[in-house]
């Protein structure tokens, strides 16, 4: 599941040549690749897509990310250099960024180092992510079934003497063992 093409189709509507994705959730939406925290940047353009990450995730990115060029960032090749090279290759002059998620420090850094005009464009992603395609609906149903199965099992295991922490840990284990990729949030167990 990746949505590079959907994002690229919306660029003209917003007057953009490309879209910079730094937020983990939006990188996942675009690429289908789940990395941790701030470890990655995706660039979507009409002429091609790019995914940049560090050495910890480069092999996994090569295996998971499709329809994008993958490159590794390091001290000699910082994100801004990789982004600038990709923008030059794809003729990006107006670059959308996630203004609702990007820190002021990151914005200042990108605005000083990138050779383009940065344009606030979180709305582009919000409008796309609001509607789900058939594959996303199927995944949501599968996730619900995994959660329900784990809940059914954990209800049988709750008894006096079992702590909330133990129940939460067991519930998380049951969901992962049942096929969940990750938790959206830590389980909340209260008595």
Regions found by a protein language model. Name each.
Residues 1-50, 80-81, 88-91, 112, ...:
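Terminal domain-start leader segments
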Residues 22-24, 53-55, 74, 97-102:
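Structural motif
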Residues 25, 57, 124:
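A generic "binding-loop/recognition-motif" signal
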Residues 26-28, 59, 103:
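Glycine-rich nucleotide phosphate-binding loop and flanking beta-alpha elements
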Residues 30-32, 61, 106-108:
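Short glycine-/acidic-enriched loop or helix-start segments at secondary-structure transitions
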Residues 47, 52-81, 85:
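Compact, glycine/acidic-enriched structural inserts
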Residues 78-183:
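Flexible, acidic/His-enriched mid-domain "rim/lid" segments that flank
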Residues 182-191:
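Acidic, glycine-rich loop-and-beta core segments that form the ion-binding/anion-interacting portion
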């Amino acid at each position: 599941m990746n949505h590079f093409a959907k994002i690229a189709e919306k660029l003209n509507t917003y007057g953009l040549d490309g879209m910079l994705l730094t937020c983990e959730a939006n990188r996942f939406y675009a690429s289908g690749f789940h990395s941790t925290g701030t470890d990655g940047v995706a660039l979507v353009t009409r002429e091609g897509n790019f995914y940049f990450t560090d050495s910890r995730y480069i092999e996994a990115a090569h295996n998971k990310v499709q329809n994008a060029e993958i490159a590794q960032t390091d001290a000699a090749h910082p994100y801004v250099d990789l982004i600038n090279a990709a923008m030059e290759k794809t003729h990006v002059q107006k670059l959308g960024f996630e203004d609702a998620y990007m820190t002021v420090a990151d914005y200042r850094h990108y605005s000083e180092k990138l050779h383009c005009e940065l344009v606030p464009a979180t709305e582009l992603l919000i409008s796309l992510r609001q509607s789900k395609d058939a594959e996303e609906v199927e995944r949501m149903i599968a996730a619900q079934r995994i959660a329900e199965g784990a809940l059914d099992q954990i209800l049988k295991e709750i008894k006096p003497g079992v702590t909330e922490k133990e129940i939460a840990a067991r519930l998380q284990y049951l969901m992962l063992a049942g096929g969940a990729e990750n938790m959206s949030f830590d389980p909340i167990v209260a008595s």
